[in-house]
Amino acid sequence: ADPNLAPAGVYSREFLVSTGLWFSLADRFIFAADVRAALNYVKSGNVDAAIVYVTDGLTEPELLIWDIVPKDSYSPISYPAAAIGDGNKHRGANTFMEFLESPEIADIFQSYGFR
């Protein structure tokens, strides 16, 4: 994904810079708007490979996940969530936040490749 458009592009660039491949392969890169577009490039045969989130790669069983990028080669990936405000008016939002932090939802996230 394009580092100017998508977080996945930023993480990909960090990995490629850390391995020394960013500059040596720069003229061969094709940037997609996002991870889904990158996966579609691979599915359509327009590119040979793409760097995508494992969670997205797992949604395309016909594609081969070739390798996992080492975690120490890019910034930590997080998906923040927040409930704005408090009180009775926002009880549903607070309940949802508690649900997201529950062990049950952690198991569901892990089953889809999130850690």
Give a label for each model feature.
Residues 1-115:
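Exported/periplasmic ABC-transporter solute-binding proteins
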